[in-house]
């Protein structure tokens, strides 16, 4: 992955909770639905993940974004990085073949008073066909930032 600002977005927030409490939400398929700021994630099917290669299905509805007429569809989340209580990342497999190759993830750093959470979206590994499509990033920085706020609220309610 790259830190090139043109191919990666990162946002941070301090959450007054332990990395373990935050990671529990991030490794649970229902946690992904709970913290989604886009309104696209409707539900998820699968068990909490515990390793690279683990998968779960997310039931989506793109109508919330009002951008592409995709309707309801499913994607499979495939875990690409799993370092318990430190980092989790995933890519998406869905209707588009081969998969696009963009990656979503979180890093967790314990600090005084809680955890510094970094949410990132990286599209540095997408194919050339996708680079020219002009649709990346598919989510704005504001959506990542909003998701961190919802994650904060979700973790506080769970503890």
Regions found by a protein language model. Name each.
Residues 1-52:
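Hydrophobic ligand-binding cavity/cleft-lining segments
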Residues 6-12, 19, 55, 74, ...:
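Intrinsic-disorder/low-complexity, polar/charged segments enriched in Ser/Thr/Lys/Arg/Asp/Glu/Gln
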Residues 11-13, 74-81, 92-94, 102-110:
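Hydrophobic/aromatic beta-strand elements that line small-molecule binding cavities or substrate pockets
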Residues 16-20, 47-51, 80-87, 107-116:
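A short, structured loop/turn motif at beta-sheet edges
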Residues 22-26, 32, 56, 79, ...:
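Hydrophobic pocket/interface hotspot
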Residues 44-93, 153-159:
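Glycine-rich portal/gate segments that line the openings of hydrophobic small-molecule binding cavities
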Residues 91-99, 120-127:
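Short, solvent-exposed aromatic-acidic interface loops
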Residues 122-159:
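A conserved amphipathic terminal alpha-helix motif
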């Amino acid at each position: 992955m790259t830190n090139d600002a043109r191919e990666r977005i990162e946002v941070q927030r301090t959450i007054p909770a332990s990395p373990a409490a935050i990671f529990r939400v991030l490794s649970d398929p229902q946690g992904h639905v709970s913290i989604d700021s886009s309104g696209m994630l409707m539900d998820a099917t699968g068990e909490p993940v515990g390793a690279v290669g683990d998968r779960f299905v997310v039931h989506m509805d793109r109508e919330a974004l009002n951008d592409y007429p995709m309707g309801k569809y499913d994607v499979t989340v495939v875990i690409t990085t799993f370092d318990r209580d430190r980092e989790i990342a995933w890519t998406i497999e869905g209707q588009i073949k081969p998969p696009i190759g963009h990656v979503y993830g979180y890093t967790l750093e314990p600090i005084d008073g809680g955890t510094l959470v970094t949410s990132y979206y990286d599209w540095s590994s997408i194919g050339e066909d996708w680079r020219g499509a002009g649709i990346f990033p598919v989510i704005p920085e504001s959506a990542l930032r909003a998701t961190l706020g919802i994650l904060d609220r979700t973790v506080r309610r769970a503890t």
